[in-house]
Amino acid sequence: MSKTHLTEQKFSDFALHPKVIEALENKGFHNCTPIQALALPLTLAGRDVAGQAQTGTGKTMAFLTSSFHYLLSHPAIDDRKVNQPRALIMAPTRELAVQIHADAEPLAQTTGLKLGLAYGGDGYDKQLKVLESGVDILIGTTGRLIDYAKQNHINLGAIQVVVLDEADRMYDLGFIKDIRWLFRRMPPANQRLNMLFSATLSYRVRELAFEQMNNAEYVEVEPEQKTGHRIKEELFYPSNEEKMRLLQTLIEEEWPDRAIVFANTKHRCEDIWGHLAADGHRVGLLTGDVAQKKRLRILDEFTRGDLDILVATDVAARGLHIPAVTHVFNYDLPDDCEDYVHRIGRTGRAGASGHSISLACEEYALNLPAIEAYIGHSIPVSKYNPEALMTNLPKPLRLTRSRPGNGPRRTGAPRNRRRSG
């Protein structure tokens, strides 16, 4: 983490359990991010927290540190059974659940607390085998958690810590009934530590906090600057006919180390993938149609740097901790203005700088006023020279369902292109 992203507050300044301090120091975490510095004094005092912070500011480590400390500092109930986890962390997507689990593993290795993972799509028996051996902290998506609970593979009667991550996304995806179903099977709110984190805290999320938490304290980091100080935003107005060529020209001009291209539909994403793969880029595709194992593999390849570009719908826009994304391209302006914030929040993370480039085409330019009103500023407009756009581009590849994650390796030096004005 960059020093500019950290506070003077050190984890060792808090009365954290020694094993938690050891795990953090082993990972090189010494100073807190702003959200951690605000949340930890409250959770260590046993207070519930509803936290709002920009994506990439350390929300995950804030609730993981709090959860591990609480479980190490408070004994489990005397008659706790093997199918009763002590902490439940709920996430809106499988990818986010997997990421939280990965972030929690170093803490688990040092503290000895056992982790479980529960998400739909695949791995039912493998996940169940881990649960049957007993876990302290269960991380998962609501559908699979309810499935296991209804079959009595898990029992929530011994829960001491609850975390809701990306709570507003839970609403967007229609999971609120599932969340309430799970809460009804836990001890009362005043008998557990409750944490809720999200990049936005809407009225409906605050209502959920009021329902399911015990007088939660609200903490916010830079709420007035929704898009982040370190993200350079840029907007182009292409015609529909020039839109794809402009994207390809910008990618050649910027030559990003690691970029995400967002579009509003899976079919548009597949089309973009085909053009970029045919042009020699190492590009992956992430949509709801991609099988779960392939989605995780593609994310892993992108994180490792084996892929340079990820083309995605908003399934990948929330909560995923993909390091060192240098550029975000909004091929389509999103219909939901909150998604604009979450999309461009993929870059400029943990104190790094980032670049967001949006294309306001004839189809989606109508979304721009609402986006700019929501973020509180106008996005700077850049012009381009249509005559400088790339030409003679190869015919786009058609997606083959057996290999949606791989394009050719991009080779050669970037082709220099210049914008006008």
Swiss-Prot record:
Return the EC number. 3.6.4.13
Residue interval(s) of motif DEAD box: 165-168
Which residue numbers delimit the Helicase C-terminal domain? 245-390
Q: Name one Pfam family in it.
A: Helicase_C
Q: Can you tell me which residues bind ATP? A: 53-60
Q: Where in the cell is it found?
A: Cytoplasm
Domain Helicase ATP-binding: residue ranges: 40-219
Q: What is its main location?
A: cytoplasm
Q: What class of enzyme is it?
A: hydrolase
A biological process (GO) of this protein is:
RNA catabolic process
Q: Where is this region: Disordered?
A: 393-421
Q: Name one GO cellular component term.
A: cytosol
Which reaction is the catalytic activity of this chain? ATP + H2O = ADP + phosphate + H(+)
Any one Gene Ontology MF annotation carried by this entry is: RNA binding
Motif Q motif, chain ranges: 9-37
Q: Which UniProt keywords apply?
A: ATP-binding, Cytoplasm, Helicase, Hydrolase, Nucleotide-binding, RNA-binding
Q: How does it assemble?
A: Component of the RNA degradosome, which is a multiprotein complex involved in RNA processing and mRNA degradation.
Please report which protein family the annotation says this sequence is part of: Belongs to the DEAD box helicase family. RhlB subfamily.
Q: What does this protein do?
A: DEAD-box RNA helicase involved in RNA degradation. Has RNA-dependent ATPase activity and unwinds double-stranded RNA.
> Any idea what this protein is called?
ATP-dependent RNA helicase RhlB
- Natural source organism: Citrobacter koseri (strain ATCC BAA-895 / CDC 4225-83 / SGSC4696)
> What gene name is listed for this protein?
rhlB
